[in-house]
From Swiss-Prot:
Protein known as: Probable Fe(2+)-trafficking protein
Gene3D superfamilies named in the record: Fe(II) trafficking protein YggX
InterPro entries: Fe_traffick_prot_YggX, Fe_traffick_prot_YggX_sf
Example GO biological process: cellular response to oxidative stress
Keyword Aminoacyl-tRNA synthetase in annotation: no
Alphabetized NCBIfam families for the sequence: PRK05408.1
Amino acid sequence: MSRTVFCCKLKQEAEGLEKQPFPGELGKKVFNEVSKQAWNMWLSHQTMLINEYRLNLIEARAREFLKEEMQKYFFGEGSDKPSGYKEIK
């Protein structure tokens, strides 16, 4: 049986993640407050950020940027798309 959470992004009860996505306090918060659907939305947004900003995830600075954007995406004012970004349909 899947667990449900009140998703902070979708503002509704939804299926929760099966496990904590990464270690630490932020990982616990995501596990407890973010739904599987919202997490998948974030993964798509994160991929777009990595590609558009040409982030190298070996660099600590790039990983910290993504962590900050994730906090904004779920718990803050939201993570914006890069200026000039055009979505391919």
